[in-house]
Amino acid sequence: MFGRTLALAAVFATTVLSAAASLEECPGYKVSNVRDNGHTLKADLRLAGKACNVYGEDIRQLKLRVEYQTHERLHVIIEDSKEDVYQVPESVFPRPESEENDSASTKSALKFSMTQKPFSFKVTRRATDEVIFDTSNSPLIFESQYLRLRTSLPDEPNLYGLGEHSDPLRLQTEDLVTTLWNRDAFGIPPGTNLYGSHPVYYDHRGRSGTHGVFLLNSNGMDVKVGSEDGDNGKKYLEYNILGGVLDFYFMAGPTPKEVASQYAEVVGLPAMMPYWGFGLHQCRYGYRDAFNVAEVVYNYSQAGIPLETMWTDIDYMDGRKVFTLDSKRFPIDEMRALVEYLHDRNQHYIVMVDPAVSYGDNDAFERGKTQDVFMKSKDGAIYKGAVWPGVTAFPDWFHPGTQDYWNNEFKLFFDPEKGIDIDALWIDMNEASNFCDWPCSDPEGWERDHDLPPAPPPVRPIPRPLPGFPDKLQPGSVRLVKRDGTRLRSKAGLPGRDLIDPPYRIQNEAGSISNKTLNTDLVHANGLVEYDTHNLYGTMLTKYRLGDNLSEWSQYRFSISQILQFAAIYQVPMVGADVCGFGGNVTEELCARWAMLGAFYPFYRNHNDIAGRDQEFYRWESVTEAARTAIGIRYKLLDYIYTAFHRQTQSGDPVLNPLFYIYPEDEDTFAIDLQFFYGDALLVSPVTEEGATSVEIYLPDDIFYDYYTGEPIEGKGDLITMENVPITHIPLHFRGGQIVPMRADSANTTTELRKQPFELVICLDREGNAEGSLYLDDGDSLEQPHTSEINFEYHNGVLKVSGKFDFQNEEALEIKNIFVLGYKQDMNVQDKGNMNKDSQYDARLKKLAIKAKILLTGPSEMTLH
């Protein structure tokens, strides 16, 4: 057996080397029939020699279209001439609009040029002639099941993106293979493909600028970064794709933040979140009954830790079946009493729903079967997998009736009058995840052999009273045709492909591309196949949990890189890791540190697995203290956070920023992924090593202020050591030049928090100036009837408040304290000419504190002199 394995390995290695050699011998394409109207260039591409057919059949005739869509965005698409090859549907990904301008090609920030035989192209910056994309060193390969395109890179590139992954923020650039194929990935291991796919990278070149490259393609792919063979050894980035077309969007930047905004113009802006969504969330897989959930809520209250939203995992379901309730452990009367209790106290409730529907005797399945909305096998029968409830069916999201079916199930089960009156929903397992190994020919056997669904815990009487809770919670009381037989439209995929075992094998950690997911030869209701659309299943949302992480220091650390990837690169800003870790048993020290760090994720939730120890923050005294401290800081900053998040929903300007986004010319920031900016003002620098009570942090050449004291610190572009950092503390610094609006105090819920007046922290830059903003709305409505967008400017001793003041509230719309950090002398204060001596100055800290009354209902001005 061992000898046979070695023989197979040798054959495989020889095959790979042979394939690689054959790829370099492919003829590429030659150009003809070029048409250029100044805005759009079109050309025909024809195979330039004998087909190489390495991983499929070469497509002999292609076409090229180049559009100068905006001043900063260039669109380049290479597709088959007949448009039979699959392309991402417009219904899933609406294409960005193009600005019509006949002279765009001569004025755009980016310039396209090409060589006609063999075809290659370059994209350069018009202002500097710097080449940012160059395919001339390797032939274009466009086959039925394989596409390859290689571009040159600088010698020491700074690349970011190409996720989802748990690797460093700045990608390694030697022998890197990043695979894009959505996978349910317990433990989120580094170096593997994870839950989502984002085929975009940012190339940051310091003073030369930053550009972005987005490939609109949902097929599985390997993106390789390395050095060419030989003495030259030039760096390259290479796409190896299982199908689709080459549909590129180039974004000129030139700053990292501008690239982020330009990318948002292509993929769409994220949705705004409710104000309460930024509070603390608590969940666990393994709450045994409704009383257990209620007791957690009670314990948080008793510990004095503000809990905004309670969650329940799949435990509430009857046999893990979606849209059902375990009537013995989570009876409807107890669930409704729990939700009513939370709502009466301005708290919220969320449950999980998986996309897979239990196959068999349940109403949700029967309705879906009647409406014909489930994925089908080749024989027309409902495709079966195995997930938590056992044998399952999967909604076909391309079926025209699926959305109505799904909406109706929600309407029935979450009926506010009769069902569970939830405030939001958690969708999980939507990679799509399937426990059953490929080929999953006997899902019923898998269910039986793996004891699905898991046995629920024994039913128990309510064990003890919970003071203040309702009586209910107290003791004692594959053919490429549509299903209708019509022919497929164009751009739906070529016939004759091997949809299960393609000739080119991407480095999917799960092995076969059909393993642990839906079979890739399944045909959707609109005729598209799962092979092409797998990476689209369940990806049209903009709120993201980073998956089943582990309670380990390494995962605590790389969660920072992950949140930065999603918020700053992929335009998915409502993101967070499971605080204290999902899998394994967290230590007290790690949980305390994570409670502090998690307060600076946009999405802040403690969640863990049924097999791990309970890890609610109140389980340890030190973690309780850390959580209280962290939430107190977060809540005082919540309007600053809310404003930064709103800004990203309007412009794409990230709510979280790597240091190089703020200091793009400082080379020492390019690789930093253990510090980050929340918004533009707040530098977060957590302790990241076990047992450490100090942390070495980098401060760029700028003025900073200690968050806790206001003490100025001159950054010199060097590392400094923060000493005596206990597990209940996290180093925070304001950046000079920023004005930060804060609530005067924290609160137990975000509803109460909104009743607090404001304070302004004016952090002077080296010239004595600062600016900031504040966004206000009602915090909940999908369509906001009245909003305020307020600008603060401090210049030459004058604070100006201007902007739009449409949001009106009976209370809390005033600034009662102003703190000026970096002020160098005592002063008097004039407010519209009236002297106000109610101020204090700390000469050592250079901190001025002023009591004020500035209404946020209209413009105002205050002079400090």
Swiss-Prot record:
Q: Name one GO cellular component term.
A: extracellular region
Pfam family of this protein, just one?
Glyco_hydro_31_2nd
Glycosylation site list: 101, 299, 515, 549, 585, 748
Catalysed conversion reaction: Hydrolysis of terminal, non-reducing (1->4)-linked alpha-D-glucose residues with release of alpha-D-glucose; Hydrolysis of terminal, non-reducing beta-D-glucosyl residues with release of beta-D-glucose
Give the signal peptide, or none.
Answer: 1-21
Q: Please tell me where this protein is predominantly located.
A: secreted
Give the enzyme's main class according to its UniProt record, as a single word: hydrolase
GO BP field: cell wall organization; polysaccharide catabolic process
**MF terms in GO:** alpha-1,4-glucosidase activity; beta-glucosidase activity; carbohydrate binding
**What is the active site of this protein?**
428, 431, 548
Q: List the disulfide bonds.
A: none
Keywords attached to this Swiss-Prot or TrEMBL record, sorted alphabetically, are:
Carbohydrate metabolism, Cell wall biogenesis/degradation, Glycoprotein, Glycosidase, Hydrolase, Polysaccharide degradation, Secreted, Signal
Q: List the InterPro entries.
A: Gal_mutarotase_sf_dom (IPR011013), Glyco_hydro_31_C (IPR048395), Glyco_hydro_31_N_dom (IPR025887), Glyco_hydro_31_TIM (IPR000322), Glyco_hydro_b (IPR013780), Glycoside_hydrolase_SF (IPR017853)
Protein origin, superkingdom: Eukaryota
Q: Which locations, inside or outside the cell, does it occupy?
A: Secreted
- Reported function: Glucosidase involved in the degradation of cellulosic biomass. Has both alpha- and beta-glucosidase activity.
Q: Which family does it belong to?
A: Belongs to the glycosyl hydrolase 31 family.
Name of the protein in question: Probable alpha/beta-glucosidase ARB_02101
Task: Give the originating organism.
Answer: Arthroderma benhamiae (strain ATCC MYA-4681 / CBS 112371)
